[in-house]
Swiss-Prot record:
GO terms for cellular component: cytoplasm. PANTHER family: AROM/DEHYDROQUINATE SYNTHASE (PTHR21090), PENTAFUNCTIONAL AROM POLYPEPTIDE (PTHR21090:SF5). It is found in: Cytoplasm. The keyword Amino-acid biosynthesis applies. Phosphoenolpyruvate binds at K21, G94, R122, Q169, R346, R388. This is 3-phosphoshikimate 1-carboxyvinyltransferase. The active site is at D315. It catalyses: 3-phosphoshikimate + phosphoenolpyruvate = 5-O-(1-carboxyvinyl)-3-phosphoshikimate + phosphate. 3-phosphoshikimate binds at K21, S22, R26, S167, Q169, D315, K342.
Length: 431
């Protein structure tokens, strides 16, 4: 599918972005492992989260929905999953594959898990390694680094794991496996990553301790089903925040967005570049939530981004790079080599996409160098099958002279179904 975009005269109005993808995944998983019913409201009905539902149905869990973005999960308890009669297909979802591996590691049965061609190229050894050290038997291509993966779960032992990468998916997989041990499993990270798993484990009844970069979970808890209200996804909101910060005449409010401190790096960086972004109506639900107002405030300034903030905005780098292309001066993004093993090589994909628009951009081994302030020109660009590249290109198209066509834009439905309709709703008009 092609997405056609023209230069915008402003984004105005009040809208809600879809439910958070990370939280939607985790709510289904913990609901399946809990006793009783879990009701998930504002669930993200994107392809990735639907893959998680499909996998747990194959593991014997009764799941109804999504119906009006509500999902009901009838939990089976920690020991209630069934051996799947078919391969578990996680589609394009790295979150589904990595987190469900932690669950499968503790099951007394055999399973095989795979994904689409993109996911089968992404590294899984960072997860299978610690799970094997806990006692799981996992095999696959490149000694268990690439899917398809065959898992023979069973009795696991707790470990103290020091993660070599700043990855919430790795942390979460090990913590989920820790639920099936007799003891305490701990994960230590160099940089803090998103903490949705820890928060949700606590909410469902697990014993979780957090201290100085280490998260520990006590095994064999009794998890109890509950209601989960999923906030709007800050990663989806990021594209609208960038667009409204850059397009003169914009005044946009996004309601009910999750503002977990481990996820709002994009707001911090855009604000430091000069964007006018205000959080209001702050409230604490399952997660911190706020309404966000962003208004055009003149040209942004370049900046340097790296270190501990990178895990807090890793998914937003494509959107941030578009802001950098229109900012005054130079923006350097470092310590983001993890982008090379996302749905695409996002460093190369972002650099190539921005270059097509005429931006001055250079790939770095672990990030990007963007020399801003050049006017962008509409172009035809590829999504590379990556939802975040497609949306970043669409935002660039809103700022470029002439027409822009984003090829392969159907991938946007992975995380932001209805993206183009929402854009049309808040667009003042097209040039």
């Amino acid at each position: 599918m092609d997405l056609h975009v023209g230069k915008s005269r402003g984004l105005r109005g009040t809208v809600a972005v879809p439910g958070d993808k990370s939280i939607s995944h985790r709510a289904v998983m913990l609901g399946a492992l809990a006793s009783g019913e879990t009701i998930i409201e504002n669930f993200l009905p994107g392809e990735d989260c639907l893959s998680t539902i499909d996998c747990f149905r194959k593991l014997g869990v009764e799941i109804n929905g999504p119906d009006n973005n509500t999902v009901r999960v009838r939990g089976r308890g920690l020991d209630g999953l069934s051996e799947p009669v078919d391969v578990l297909d996680t589609g394009n979802s790295g979150t589904t594959m990595r987190l469900i591996l932690g669950v499968l590691a503790g099951q007394p049965f055999f399973s095989v898990i795979t994904g689409d061609s993109s996911l089968r190229r992404r590294p899984m050894g960072r997860v299978t390694g610690p799970l094997i050290s806990m006692g799981a038997k996992i095999d696959g291509r490149q000694n268990g680094n690439l899917a398809p993966l065959a898992v023979r779960g069973g009795t696991l032992r707790p470990i103290n794991f020091v993660s070599p990468v700043a990855s919430a998916q790795v942390k979460s997989a090990v913590l989920l496996a820790g639920l099936f041990t007799d003891g305490v499993t701990a994960v230590t990270e160099a940089y803090r990553t998103r903490d949705h798993t820890e928060r949700m484990l606590r909410a469902f009844g697990a014993g979780v301790e957090v201290s100085e970069g280490t998260v520990a979970v006590k095994g064999r808890p009794r998890l109890t089903g509950r209601k989960v209200k999923v906030p709007g996804d800050i990663s989806s909101a990021a594209f609208l925040l960038v667009a409204a910060s850059l397009i003169p005449g914009s005044d946009l409010t996004l309601t009910g967005v999750g503002v977990n401190p481990t996820r709002i790096g994009i707001i911090e960086v855009l604000s430091s570049m000069g964007a006018e972004i205000r959080l209001f109506n702050l409230r604490e639900e399952e997660e911190p939530v706020a309404d966000i107002r962003v208004r055009y405030n003149g040209r942004l300034c370049g900046t340097a981004v790296g270190g501990e903030i990178i895990p807090r905005l890793i998914d937003e780098v494509p959107a941030l790079a578009v802001a950098a292309a229109l900012a005054e001066g130079k923006t350097v993004i470092r310590d983001a080599a993890e982008l090379k093993v996302k749905e695409s090589d996002r460093i190369a994909a972002v650099a190539g996409m921005l270059a097509k628009f005429g931006a001055d951009v250079e790939e770095l081994p672990d990030g990007l160098l963007v020399r801003g302030s050049r006017a962008l020109k509409g172009c035809v660009c590829e999504s590379h099958g990556d939802h975040r590249i497609a949306m970043a290109a669409a935002v660039a198209g809103l700022l470029a002279e002439g027409k822009t066509i984003v090829r392969g834009a159907e991938c946007i439905s992975v995380s932001f179904p209805g993206f183009s309709d929402l854009l049309a709703k808040v667009m003042v008009d097209w040039q």
